[in-house]
Every structure is written in structure tokens, then in C-alpha cells.
Regions:
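Second-shell residues forming the walls of enzyme active-site clefts
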Residues: 101, 121, 146-166, 180-182, ...
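Short acidic, glycine-rich surface-loop motifs adjacent to enzyme active sites
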Residues: 128-147, 226, 236-237, 312-335, ...
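Solvent-exposed loop/turn segments at secondary-structure junctions
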Residues: 115-119, 143-146, 176-181, 224, ...
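Extracytoplasmic/periplasmic mature domains of Sec-exported, cell-envelope-associated bacterial proteins
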Residues: 86, 93-96, 100-103, 109, ...
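A substrate-binding/cap region within the structured catalytic cores of diverse enzymes
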Residues: 194-222, 229-261, 265, 443-453, ...
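Hydrophobic faces of well-ordered beta-strands that scaffold small-molecule active sites
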Residues: 107-114, 135-139, 170-176, 224-228, ...
Length: 633
């Protein structure tokens, strides 16, 4: 089967128009054993204007949050919105599933990771698609260099799937939450993450960021986003969720989460809400351990489950389960929610009425891989009611998982009927999102466009939050002309190659800046920066300290280097202004800092926003979506 996509990008006064045309060529001998589908795009496509805010959005009370004028241009999109009336009937899907061998059905229920940035570089990818007929791919940073390369990789994989025995297109998924949780950073627009968007108080930004991100993802051939995070972050010291959440309020998470889901799915990218039944109140990172949520059933109902009920009502395509223990929902000691039939089937499928695809989180994570091993964990997850398991690791691990699932069905440990129901859900979604008609990449002109970057800049500026300023350092006073800037290596580099973008922007505005860049993963870097900072601090008017992952490192690694350095600087009597580049809960670990500015992430848009606030070109207008109670308050 050969798919040829012709795409054009037109500029109109109202914004962007993406025009897609699909030429589908298949010889009679190549006819795929799938139900015939109406072409996804007619010869005279009509465009659908996508507003920046969906019609049903409930805006906050007037005066409750700072506002900025919306300057993002309207978006017009053709041929990408989901067309549900072109999905084959259930009877037709049953016929298709009945014709599939068990091995192919199990393949469809697996989404896999792989090495390499081209099909020719990855024998694993070729085998997984052509031999095991896996249902989907999970793109990681190692697979993604830039939009052109990603699009080429996706097209190669989809063409291989079209030529394989199953001829079923692939889900191509990615973690593209926004902020610092993205897998493609070069060439795409870096939109602020969830907590930054919530800090603006503007749900329309959630819709716009998701809609524009979806346009960029689908242009690269990516059809599923493992987002949004719908965890209610009611523990400000949570080391794994933090800024990935919309905040501590279930109402706020529900409001902003709804707009995000709509933004993705109305622009042709399946959304996967996570981490069910809720990861926001934990104090352990599930990547390294097995957290426990010690809440009553009533508390879970009111807080953790509320955003997921919304997602079910809004028709989210997928929900990802979490690797954590919830005793109020599962009585078996130590059994994670992701392997609990009481949670996956009892609560999500039956009680909440979710009819979409249930995915596991990666089975290669910490306690799961160590406690069960991925093959056994996959069997337990499917027995619980999971439709798709996320495999992690080399080909040998993935094939062991595939073999374990096939054997479990053959032994009667998993019913054939359950497998068929899962595969029907998977195929239905692939039809609904037009993958059988066009799973390939499109026109990349929209990716990283000037219009999208302008929107990201506006959102980031509206998010910057001044938590407190007891020292009167924001904007920088006229007495602070010589700055010592301590920056994490995660900040974007300066265009001139000298230090970070932040230091360059401050210098461009007439400030004398010396910068020390620290790499928290390099002991030598940390020791050198610590010594140089303490020695040189007396020669500067102000120390600008850039916090990075303080919460995560303190919880996961007992790493208190940043707290120690801040304490030493304050003890010396120097003025210290802390920029919280990641989780605002970090402020609780250094409550003695008198001035704290919160950026929520280190995208270029967020760095530019912080610089504007520091030099007085803009006022900080964000509101912290968390409650932080400092000692003595």
C-alpha cells in the first residue's frame, strides 16, 4: 500500500489554514483486510475554524485572576478534526477482529519503545512492526532530533506497518505535556506546562496551547499524546508531579484539563489522561519506588477521581493507569492500581463508564520492573482490564512480554473475549482518527511557527508569579547593577554561545552579569560552583539563584546542595533573589529566601518572560496554583 500526502500551507487574514489532500493508491492484490472507509478528506475540503477557547468553557470570576489581552491569532484547520461517523460499525469491526490471529491481537495491545532515529538504525523497530505487529510506538528523546527527522521516522514505520501482515496503522505516541516534559525540544514550539498555564488563570490558554501543540504533533505524524496530567497536586512536596499538574484544586484541574483534552482531540491528536486514579498526593516518585495513596474512598471521590470523571464525560480517547497502591480501592496489600481489577475494571470501566482505551504506565518503571518483571506485570495489567501495555527496554524484554500475554490467553488466564473487546477499542480509535486513510506526516511549516512562538511567549509571561518580595528586588532596583547569576545547565543557551539565554537578555538590557552554570549531575561542577560563588559573592550587588529540581533531588537522592548554597549566601548577608524554574514547592525547603519568582519551567518563552519581569518591562501577573504555608505564617 502506498500513501501519498500532498499538503499546502496558506496564510490568510484570520490566521493559518492547513489544506490537506490525500491520494490513496492500492492495487487489488494489496487490498488490506479491513472494513472500507470513507476517504478522510473530500476533494473539496471545508475548513473548520477552531476558536482559542471552546464554546463550553467556564471562565473564572471577574477579578479573580490577572488577565492579559488575547493576541493569539485564530486557527483554521481542515481535514484534521475527528470524524466519528466514518468509523466502521461494531459488526464490521467484529468481523475484522475475528479474522485476526491471536498473535496479531496481542501485538495491537502493545506500545513499544525502541532505539534509533531511523528505521535503518533500528533492527528492533523493524522486528516489532513487521514480525510482532505491535499496535503502537512510544517516541523518546533518543528517537527525536528535530521535526524533519521525526516525520521521516514516523513515515518509515507507518509504511512498514502497511506492508506487514496485519496492515494496521500504528499509534505513534509521545510525552508532550509542555514545559520541560517534552521529548522533542528542537524545532518545535515550547509551550508552558500545565501549572504555568493554570497560573495565568485563563482556561482559553489551555485550549490554545493544546490545539497548537496538536497541530505540530500531527504534522510530524504523531497521533497520540500521553497527556494531559490530571493529577490533583495537593501535596506541594510531591517529587514527581509538581508543575506537571494544573494545581491543588480538583475544580481547577478539571477546568483546565477539559480545555486541554478538547484542544488535542479537536485537532486530530488522541489525548491520554493520566495517572489514574491520581498521583498528586504522593511523596514517592513511582519511577523509583511504589507510592501509596492513603486516602479514604470519599476523599478519593472528591479530589483524585473528579478530573477523570470529567475526562470520561468529555470523551477522552485514553486513560493511563498509575503504578501506586490505593488501599481504599484495592484491598490486596501492595498491589498497584495498574494491576488491580477492582480499580481498572471496577472503578474506571464499570463505575465511571469509561468506554475508551485504558493504557498502563510504562512497565519498565522502578518498583514494577523490580517487583514483578515486565512480562508478568503485563499479564497482571491485562487481567485487570488494561487494553494497551507500555513496554520498555530491549527487544528481548518486549518479546518476552508478548509471549507471556499469548501464553496467558492460551491457558485461559485471560479470556479471548476480553482480548477481542480491547482490540475493537483500539481499531475504533485508529479509524476515528483517520489512521487507515492517512497516518503519515504532513506539512511541517506549522511546527515552531512564528505565530505559535508568539502565543507561547504570551502565555509564559502571563504565568510568571511573584510568590513574595520582602526585599523589594522585583523589578531589579537601580542599586542592583552588578549581578552574579547562578543558572542550572537546563536553561537554554545564549544565541552568542556565551552562557545562558537569561544572562544574555540581562546583559542586553545594560546589566553587568557574571554567570556560573551548574550541572547537578556532575559533582565536580557542583563543588566548583559552590566554592566560586561563596568566594565571589561579595563583589556583586545581588545574587540571582536559579533553582532546579530541588524537590525531586531532595526526595529521591537526599541531595541538599542547593539548600546548602542558598543558606551560605544568605548567611553572608548578600541579597538573594531566587527564580524557581520548576516546582514552586521548592520554596518550602528554603523558606528563608526573601524574594521568590516562579517561572514553572525553562522553555525559551519562560526564560524571556522572567527576564522581562526582572528588568521591569512587564509585571508578574500569575497566581500560584498551590498553597504554600511557610514557617511562622
Amino acid at each position: 500500500m502506498a500513501l501519498v500526502v500532498l499538503a499546502g500551507l496558506l496564510m490568510v487574514s484570520g490566521g493559518l489554514v492547513l489544506v490537506w489532500r490525500l491520494d490513496r493508491q492500492r492495487s487489488a492484490s494489496q487490498a488490506a483486510p479491513v472494513p472500507s472507509a470513507v476517504p478522510f478528506v473530500s476533494s473539496s475540503p471545508t475548513s473548520t475554524t477552531i476558536p482559542l477557547v471552546s464554546p463550553s468553557v467556564e471562565l473564572p470570576q471577574a477579578g479573580s485572576m490577572a488577565t492579559l489581552p488575547v493576541t493569539v491569532p485564530p486557527m483554521t484547520l481542515t481535514a484534521r478534526p475527528v470524524v466519528t461517523d466514518r468509523v466502521p460499525s461494531d459488526d464490521a469491526l467484529r468481523v475484522q477482529v475475528a479474522q485476526m490471529p491471536l498473535a496479531d491481537k496481542i501485538g495491537q495491545m502493545m506500545m513499544v519503545q525502541f532505539d534509533g532515529q531511523r528505521l535503518a538504525e533500528s533492527a528492533d523497530l523493524a522486528a516489532l512492526v513487521s514480525t510482532y505487529h505491535v499496535g503502537g510506538l512510544v517516541l523518546l528523546e533518543a528517537n527525536a532530533h528535530d521535526p524533519q527527522q521525526v516525520a521521516q521516522l514516523v513515515d518509515e514505520a507507518q509504511r512498514l506497518a502497511a506492508q506487514s501482515g496485519s496492515r494496521i496503522p500504528l499509534f505513534v505516541s509521545i510525552n508532550h505535556e509542555g514545559g520541560n516534559v517534552v521529548r522533542i525540544s528542537q524545532g518545535v514550539t515550547g509551550f508552558p506546562g500545565n501549572m504555568a498555564i493554570a497560573a495565568t488563570g485563563r482556561p482559553e490558554y489551555a485550549y490554545a496551547a493544546a490545539a497548537m501543540a496538536a497541530q505540530e504533533l500531527r504534522a510530524m505524524g504523531i497521533n497520540m499524546n500521553l497527556a494531559p496530567v490530571l493529577d490533583v497536586n495537593d501535596n506541594p512536596l510531591n517529587p514527581v508531579i509538581g508543575v506537571r499538574s494544573f494545581g491543588e484544586s480538583p475544580d481547577q484541574v478539571t477546568l483546565f484539563g477539559r480545555e486541554t483534552i478538547k484542544g488535542f482531540q479537536q485537532n486530530g491528536v488522541m489525548a491520554v489522561a493520566k495517572h489514574f486514579p491520581g498521583h498528586g498526593s504522593t511523596a514517592v516518585d513511582s519511577h523509583v519506588g511504589l507510592p501509596t495513596v492513603n486516602k479514604t474512598a470519599a476523599q478519593l471521590e472528591q479530589v483524585e477521581l473528579a478530573p477523570f470523571r470529567m475526562a470520561v464525560t468529555e470523551g477522552v480517547e485514553g486513560i493511563m493507569t498509575a503504578h501506586l497502591v490505593v488501599p481504599a480501592l484495592e484491598t490486596t496489600p501492595g498491589l498497584p492500581a495498574s494491576m488491580s481489577r477492582a480499580v481498572v475494571t471496577g472503578v474506571l470501566r464499570q463505575r465511571m463508564g469509561f468506554e475508551g482505551i485504558i493504557l498502563s504506565d510504562s512497565l519498565g518503571m522502578g518498583a514494577i520492573a523490580q517487583g514483578w518483571g515486565q512480562p508478568q506485570a503485563a499479564v497482571r495489567a491485562v487481567q485487570a482490564g488494561t487494553d494497551i501495555v507500555l513496554a520498555s527496554g530491549p527487544l528481548e524484554t518486549t518479546t518476552a512480554m508478548w509471549n507471556a500475554l499469548v501464553a496467558a490467553v492460551q491457558r485461559g488466564e485471560i479470556s479471548a473475549g476480553q482480548i477481542d473487546a480491547s482490540v475493537m477499542r483500539i481499531l475504533r480509535a485508529k479509524h476515528r482518527y483517520g489512521l487507515f486513510e492517512n497516518g503519515l506526516s504532513g506539512n511541517l511549516s506549522v511546527v515552531g511557527s512564528a505565530e505559535h512562538q508568539a502565543a507561547a511567549d504570551e502565555m509564559a509571561l502571563a504565568a510568571v508569579t511573584l510568590f513574595r518580595d520582602q526585599a523589594g528586588l522585583v523589578p531589579l532596583p537601580s542599586s542592583a547593577r552588578r549581578l552574579l547569576v547562578l543558572s542550572p545547565s537546563e536553561l537554554p543557551p545564549a544565541q552568542d554561545g556565551g552562557g545562558t539565554m537569561l544572562a544574555q537578555l540581562l546583559r542586553d538590557n545594560g546589566l553587568e552579569v557574571a554567570e556560573l552554570i551548574f550541572d547537578l549531575d556532575q559533582l565536580s561542577s557542583r563543588e566548583a560552583v559552590y566554592a566560586q560563588t561563596v568566594k565571589a559573592a561579595s563583589g556583586y550587588d545581588l545574587i540571582l539563584f536559579g533553582e532546579w529540581e530541588l524537590l525531586k533531588r531532595s526526595a529521591n537522592q537526599s541531595d541538599h546542595w542547593q539548600e546548602s548554597l542558598i543558606a551560605a549566601l544568605l548567611k553572608s548577608g548578600k541579597q538573594v533573589l531566587m527564580v524557581v524554574w520548576r516546582d514552586p514547592g521548592a520554596i518550602l525547603l528554603v523558606p528563608q529566601v526573601p524574594t521568590c519568582l516562579v517561572a514553572y519551567g525553562t522553555t525559551s518563552a519562560q526564560v524571556k518572560a522572567v527576564a522581562k519581569v526582572l528588568i521591569g518591562q512587564a509585571m508578574p501577573q500569575g497566581h500560584l496554583p498551590l498553597t504554600l504555608v511557610l514557617p511562622g505564617h
